[in-house]
Amino acid sequence: MLGSGNEEMSTLPGLNQIQLEGFCRFIDRGLTEGLFKFPKIEDTDQEIEFQLFAETYQLLEPLINEKDAVYESLTYSAELYVSTGLIWKSSRDIKKQTIFVGNIPLMNSLGTSIVNGIYRIVINQILQSPGIYYRSELDPNGISVYTGTIISDWGGRLELEIDKKARIWARVSRKQKISILILLSAMGSNLSEILENVCYPEIFVSFLNDKDKKKIGSKENAILEFYRQFACVGGDPVFSESLWKELQKKFFQQRCELGRIGRRNMNQKLNLDIPQNNTFLLPRDILTAASHLIGMKFGMALLDDINHLKNKRIRSVADLLQDQFGLALVRLENMVRGTICGAIRHKLIPTPQNLVTSTPLTTTYESFFGLHPLSQVLDQTNPLTEIVHGRKLSYLGPGGLTGRTASFRIRDIHPSHYGRICPIDTSEGINVGLIGSLAIHARIGIWGAIESPFFEISERSKRIRMLYLSPSIDEYYMVATGNSLALTRDIQEEQIVPARYRQEFLTIAWEQVHLRSIYPFQYFSIGASLIPFIEHNDANRALMSSNMQRQAVPLSQSEKCIVGTGLECQVALDSGVSAIADHEGNIVYTDTDRIFLFVNGDTLSIPLTIYQRSNKNTCMHQKPQVHRGKFIKKGQILADGAATVGGELALGKNVLVAYMPWEGYNSEDAVLISERLVYEDIFTSFHIRKYEIQTHMTSYGSERITNKIPHLEANLLRNLDKNGIVILGSWVETGDVLVGKLTPQMAKESSYSPEDRLLRAILGIQVSTSKETCLKLPIGGRGRVIDVRWIQKKGGSSYNPETIRISILQKREIKVGDKVAGRHGNKGIVSKILSRQDMPYLQDGEPVDMVFNPLGVPSRMNVGQIFECSLGLSGGMLDKHYRITPFDERYEQEASRKLVFSELYEASKKTSNPWIFEPEYPGKSKIFDGRTGNSFKQPAIMGKTYILKLIHQVDDKIHGRSSGHYALVTQQPLRGRAKQGGQRVGEMEVWALEGFGVAHILQEMLTYKSDHIKTRQEVLGTTIIGGTIPKPTDAPESFRLLVRELRSLAMELNHFLVSEKNFRIHRKEA
């Protein structure tokens, strides 16, 4: 963010800045630090020494561009070259060589990486910051137990605990603890040093007996005692160097390495002056921590709030990539050490080129981007989704929390979150509160803390200064809130203002204020900042709106919103979906594929994205917005991308809506829509699906791609060319063959003809047949073939098979079952598409496009949609667009309502339509029934609302099954649309059928429509001949499975039939 010295003006930071800064920090510092830690490697005889020279590493430019990497399923990476040296100690000869170490995936200008042709992004993680934290808990007797927990940079914990006798223990686990004196002696301190450097020596002396004095008499005795309690399996250990190394590896390395951030936190918390480069836990740290713990017991210090952001740190993309780089260098070290020993054993002369291989680094980063929980496939549903995905903050992941163990206190909003983590935008479900979003003005500092900007208020100087403060600093200042959120200082500050100080809200004089917020949007994420009139909505509905805006699909004809917040331009710009001019010049030529720009005597070709598939199967497409001969300035928009218009974010459409009931078709969040939305392609979207198939080398030969497929109808093969691949531009339906493929296999003995058996018996010839393994279009995949790609890898081995990739474009109009939503959490499913003449219409004869249920507003308390609806009506009439900053009530009361009514009044005057604003019921109007022409009894709210079409579409969900596969164990239909599964009649469904007394339907559902093998086979034949469906006579397979499982537990279960006459029992096996 940039601040002006004379004016209170600021610009938003780059929304991708958090990702780009992290990756640049890794390239600038992380690579050098990792290479400097690489040790010198010697052979067993210490005659040869290998080392890396970290000062002279090189990163080469990628050989391919981003688009080619995506199209060819490659990784957009740079080659890393490092200077190495091999030294012969006897002759002091040195052989230097620059060697290729491996590939490092790069980050593009949008903050994403391309790995195997897929856009991926690394999520920032929130972890407990290394350091020491004091807390108090009650024991079973109700007595307070004070503890100090030291958290290492590895995540290991060492807990200092003081009991009721004022004895201090070091606890490693719940059951294991040891005296702090033994721990300090094992770390190298003697008793006199301990007593000299502690604040309360008499307490340490009080619980020291003769036995303990013997244990801490020397460092060796203390180490033996420490090892005996924590690491010894059995026997009486003897001190040795290997024992000390084992103890270091098992205990000290994991629990005592603080790291750079941990050392800083320890120094600040305990008032120490230990150098920053000393990142290991020292005896002085433990002594000072013990003194603080004793003072805590006597009420001389404060407990720590573990959920405060000052006690958290952000593990950014730089830290994750650096950790993986260190892991790769450890693997490289082991590989080099083994290669040197092998070369000496076989009396070979090693060279740096033979010792170093690129496999450790390349495979480490491939596995990280492909398998790590914090490396995710980029959500490319729309431009907003791409931006928001890179700004997520997660408590989950390695070293973090889990969704099932996290408490409510961790999930809840903390006062330190304000201005740093959005209090609204989080995921729904089990991860609620654990995945947040960075506030729009926040940034990550060099120490891993989230910093928020403030304006400093100084009486001495009139110059405004903007500060970025961490959570540990701003809580000590008086921060003004409320009316001080005004955008200008023209408003006279009141004498008494509300302020925030140390997580409390106070009312103080203006002279006592130190800082004030810079913008009303400062507290919210990008998703929440795009909601107009958000202050009039319930927080739960604002949360839903933030999530649903990320689910909106780009429409074929985008339209920017009439009522917005002003951030739409920034989101569209930083998303990178629009083509921006890098130079000024004249447009020479333009078409749908590229734009030619004449700059300083040269002609630059600017390629455009044409019908490219995103990770969410939506369509990414750029449309030129400039014409031939036009002069273009630097930074001007050349082409709009998906879901952008004129450089602004455009996720939906402004449609005319009315809030009224209509024959029950809009009850319970159902939505009634007009057929105009279908015929005029108002909510039509394009979706691109990718289908691929590979050819492998089998034990009976290689698979063949061909258009001659036996036993298949010619109609299914009509779109194949002579090579057996679908023709570009073909229209394909469900079941059509996209790629014809035959897989060779051996035929069974019983299927051989007499001639084949004779040949096998006389000549030993193996007769083989081929199995049809074609790529067929699955259910719901109808569309137009827009791309065919045959990727042939060099070598053609079975490990690098050939891949054929087909892309199919679908045009989807809005239909019954699709999900639509507004920007206020008002969502619904399309229930009926009504003809235009039957839709309710306004007083000027215009039919409405959508009818919402008015009962969905008051109970959900999202009144912002009513303000937007009425203001959108006036904007549509006046051809105006509004950009409303939230919390406009900071100027005056009822500011939003006054704005809306004044604009409605102006629209009614200028258009000479008095029904737009009627004083008797402002904002409402009489609406007429399109079927009868009569007006409805009560006036209703109507206007223009910005409606989104979400990615939850009926074409992806609707499913039916007549017959299909059954599970092998339970013999019941499979589950899921992808497996052509059936519906499950569960416990509650059985209750419902029982309640209606439909015994025969219930029997059908539980037997031959489900898992009664014998009867369901007989049903088909009797249905064909028109016979009576047989009744099942024995138990279904699920009951048999229950019996078998009980038998596996040594329990026998049988059922018996009792006759009515003599009650004799006839045993029948289950």
Swiss-Prot record:
A Pfam family this protein belongs to? RNA_pol_Rpb2_3
User: Mainly resides where?
Assistant: plastid
PROSITE patterns (UniProt xref): RNA_POL_BETA
Where is this protein found? Plastid, Chloroplast
| Swiss-Prot/TrEMBL keywords | Chloroplast, DNA-directed RNA polymerase, Nucleotidyltransferase, Plastid, Transcription, Transferase
Q: Name one GO biological process term.
A: DNA-templated transcription
Q: Which GO terms describe its molecular function?
A: DNA binding; DNA-directed RNA polymerase activity; ribonucleoside binding
Q: Which InterPro entries match?
A: DNA-dir_RNA_pol_bsu_ext_1_sf, DNA-dir_RNA_pol_su2, DNA-dir_RNAP_su2_dom, DNA-dir_RNAP_su2_hyb_sf, RNA_pol_bsu_bac, RNA_pol_bsu_CS, RNA_pol_Rpb2_2, RNA_pol_Rpb2_2_sf
GO cellular component annotations of the record:
chloroplast; DNA-directed RNA polymerase complex; mitochondrion
Q: Which reaction does it catalyse?
A: RNA(n) + a ribonucleoside 5'-triphosphate = RNA(n+1) + diphosphate
Transit peptide among keywords: no
User: Is this entry keyworded Transcription?
Assistant: yes
What SUPFAM superfamilies does the annotation carry? beta and beta-prime subunits of DNA dependent RNA-polymerase
Enzyme Commission no: 2.7.7.6
Q: HAMAP family, from UniProt?
A: RNApol_bact_RpoB (MF_01321)
- Family indicated by similarity: Belongs to the RNA polymerase beta chain family.
| Function summary | DNA-dependent RNA polymerase catalyzes the transcription of DNA into RNA using the four ribonucleoside triphosphates as substrates.
Q: Subunit info?
A: In plastids the minimal PEP RNA polymerase catalytic core is composed of four subunits: alpha, beta, beta', and beta''. When a (nuclear-encoded) sigma factor is associated with the core the holoenzyme is formed, which can initiate transcription.
Q: What is this protein called?
A: DNA-directed RNA polymerase subunit beta
Q: What is the organism field in this record?
A: Phaseolus vulgaris
